[in-house]
UniProtKB/Swiss-Prot annotation:
Pathway it works in: Amine and polyamine biosynthesis; spermidine biosynthesis; spermidine from putrescine: step 1/1
GN (gene name): speE
NCBIfam families: MFS_SpdSyn, PRK00811.1, speE
Enzyme Commission number: 2.5.1.16
GO molecular function, one term: spermidine synthase activity
UniProt binding sites for spermidine: 86
Protein name, UniProt field: Polyamine aminopropyltransferase
PABS domain segment(s): 2-237
């Protein structure tokens, strides 16, 4: 008998992954966590029935939220990751010698423990002495921070449930205050392909656009994401992701990647027409 994991991407679209076995299932104070073994995507983790990452394609997401801002900002030293309890984002950041401190705010201890047990290679990004994990509510954590971080990466999963407060105007305003005068915020922007997800994308862009002087959106192909098409947001007080992009300087760092390139960086900001129109409509509101 074959076993399949199924996730509804819309009322009319279902995403299925054949499963060899279930490795873990548990309920934390915040969410249900499951880990599966599959022949196509390797091990993959789900929260409340939605795929969060897999061994096969997690490198795409991690590289795109890290190397895009790191190739623009000339001297990132202090980083805040909101979420990030799997260690994938911090692992990418740790390739940069100039980074002195990485704060990870992850309120779900069970999520961190599960990732350490079942995804040790990814979770190795939690073990460096530059990394500090805070078991705290991110919104509350941010309220006390001002002019502190060069880069904030919002790695929260979605604008619902336990992460709902991380997609509000108050949250983005607190990010603005917590960033230094030349700081950058990067966040996952979701996918606008299905009607059910479009409203969240619109709302997110509207809030960030009216909070930061520079706000752009870029894209990547992530197979396990809804529709396979995923957007990211880049917001900054000073740096533009293309005008201040320094490809030659980034290449001299000899950073290892499997997805990100300096050519891809430029192309990632060239959005399809329907996405451009959606974003422009929110900028005019």
């Amino acid at each position: 008998m074959e076993f399949w994991f199924s996730e509804l991407h819309s009322p009319h679209v279902k995403f299925d992954i054949r499963v060899e076995k279930q490795l873990f299932s548990g309920e934390s104070d915040y969410q249900r966590i499951d880990v599966f073994q599959s022949p196509e995507f390797g091990k993959f983790l789900t929260l409340n029935g939605s795929v969060i990452f897999s061994e096969q394609d997690c490198f795409i997401y991690n590289e795109m939220v890290v190397h895009v801002p790191m190739s623009v900002h000339p001297d990132v030293k202090n980083v805040l990751i909101i979420g990030g309890g799997d260690g994938g984002v911090s692992k990418e950041l740790l390739q940069y010698d100039n980074i002195e401190n990485i704060d990870i705010v992850e309120q779900d201890n069970m999520f961190v423990d599960v990732c350490r047990e079942y995804f040790p290679e990814t979770a190795s990004g939690l073990e460096d002495e530059r990394v500090h994990i805070y078991n705290s509510d991110a919104l509350r954590f941010l309220r006390s921070k001002q002019d502190m971080y060069d880069l904030i990466i919002n790695d929260a999963t979605d604008p619902f449930g336990a992460s709902e407060g991380l997609f509000t105007r108050e949250f983005y305003g607190n990010c603005y205050k917590a960033l230094k005068e030349d700081g950058i915020l990067v966040y996952q922007h979701g996918s606008p392909f299905y009607d059910e997800d479009e409203d969240a994308c619109r709302s997110m862009h509207r809030k960030v656009f009216h909070t930061f002087p520079i706000s752009r959106v870029y894209q990547a192909h992530i197979p396990t994401s809804p529709s396979g098409y995923w957007l990211f947001g880049f917001a900054s007080k000073k740096y533009h992701p293309l005008k201040d992009f320094k490809p030659a300087e980034w290449k001299r760092r000899n950073i290892h990647t499997e997805y990100y390139t300096t050519n891809l960086h430029t192309g990632a900001f060239m959005l399809p027409k329907y996405v451009e129109e959606l974003l422009e409509q929110e900028e005019e509101r």
